[in-house]
């Protein structure tokens, strides 16, 4: 089973909406579970997160944090989820995770990705390989990746 944590309030910025759509479209590939009939469950806040951890999480579940940061680099719903992970230190034991962080400006995305990675790790979640992908407002940090893959910066991130 794949859980996608996408904490956001209010209107969804277009690029973030595209990010979530891309994650959901590829949910079966990410989860690797061909028998899984439900491709993904969306977790929007700490209540959804705790409910999933307590009732729906199975050994080997995958969890993807797809996070949008505003200009200030703050996402209050995300902080509430991180707080719950700190209180329930084994809530993600046996899970595998990935992190995608999208931001409105050039700051905060890498710092937030590291905070999420730390909390996931403390909660027992395994983060293999390249743990996170982050996109700054201009997508300048995707230039090298795009050049290597012969894509636009936007295509490289998605």
For the regions a language model picked out, list residue spans one by one:
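FMN-binding flavodoxin-like domain, especially the glycine-rich phosphate-binding loop
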Residues: 1-158
